[in-house]
Amino acid sequence: MKKEIRLLDVELRTPEDNDKMIVEGYAVTFNSPATHGYTEIINEHALDNTDMSDVPLKYNHEDSHLIMARTRNKSLELAKDEKGLFIRAELIDTQSNKDIYKSIKAGLIDKMSFAFTVRGDEYDYDTDTRTITDIDKLYDVSVVDMPFYDSTSVYARGENDEFLERRSELRKEHEEQMKEEERKARLKEAKDKLLKRLG
């Protein structure tokens, strides 16, 4: 399974707290179609069996940057609800976190993204829609300052090439199946005409 990354245009906010640097937002949203060459939807049960045992909050998914918060030490909380995966992080007191926090508060950073692997998905040939039904592991959630991506874009860095290849194969299989069904229909029509003449 290859790691995939998705960027979401969701609300990222800093609740008023005079003593702590708190960041909240949705890292994953359910049943919200995103289009990027094909339509993708994350099913509301996709996180039911996901490994979220040690999830860090990062900046732009960068490993070189200090981790901002983490579930392991309870500075990052994850809560699944009917909308998606809600995160609440208490940032530790470092200069880099202070800078990021100020940028979020000023609205300069207002996007979230998540890195994950897929265990189960479905593909609808007619609507060209991929539905992610089972996310295997959540590797990290990130606050990101990428240029604005609207609902027609996804930040994927090419990690979903494997799915795109499989999608092409599935489309080819579907087309072959349709041709076979069309051939059978023509044969049946010819047979019916012949029987009608003989009758």
Where are these regions (language model features)?
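Polar/acidic, low-complexity leader/linker segments enriched in S/T/G and N/D
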Residues: M1-D54, R167-K172, K184-E189
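A general structural signal for short secondary-structure boundary/capping elements
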Residues: K2-K3, V28, R70-L76, I135, ...
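Residue microenvironments linked to proteolytic maturation
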Residues: D9-P15, I22, K74-E173
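Short glycine-rich, polar/acidic loop-and-turn segments at beta strand-coil junctions
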Residues: A27-N31, H61-D63, L91-D93
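Flexible loop/turn segments at secondary-structure boundaries
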Residues: S32-A34, H65-L66, D121-Y123
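Short helix/loop capping segments that flank catalytic or ligand/cofactor-binding pockets
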Residues: A34-H36, I67, Y149-T152
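A glycine-rich, hydrophobic loop/mini-helix early in the fold
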Residues: M52-A89
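Charged/polar low-complexity intrinsically disordered segments, enriched in acidic residues
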Residues: G158-G199
